[in-house]
């Protein structure tokens, strides 16, 4: 029996990159998965096709034969966040695992950052996570079940990142949200943890990948000497979503090749 067989997982922002990798790994471990996207339906459908290729059975005769389902939602809108949770439950009948992966960043010197950009980052990276988690926990309480919450943070919950101050603040907030909820939700049998990736080879880093000088400088800061892959993050998420991690909560796990302890600002 696979570790996540019979479980249903929602992964926000999962049409590409790290989120896509997480969806595929959870499906490989037997979970049915909800693939969320904001503005990339083609990526969501491509992810769904890969999930369907993995195979597997639904846990009820009423649900589709595939293991996957796509839902559009903007995580910067609380109304859409709540509807995303509701639609996921309506489709599969329940939710067991929530992976808060969706995130955005805005580049600007601190003294030039606009209120609109600040709000955009905070709404997705922190506010959206807060209310998605709240709706998920309400579902677990109503159905008298336990569950797993995994937040995708960043090494920048600890590392300064000049010109991305709002992003760093959002990830620092996510760290404390996780710690606080581990205490508040522990008695309910609900665990919550952060996974903090470093430099991962994804579409969001295309500009970096095409700049040999900057890429070389970054690699010199990574003791393992390479960029991470989505599967590096996904494997840890799958572990934290399983019963093998039943006694782990309130922690941040860095997936960064050692970058955090060897970082020198370029």
Q: What kind of region is each of these model predictions?
A:
Residues 154:
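Residue(s) in the substrate-gating loop at a strand-loop-helix junction
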Residues 8, 15-17:
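Conserved glycine-rich cofactor-binding loop
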Residues 159, 238, 249-266:
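Short C-terminal tail/terminal secondary-structure segment
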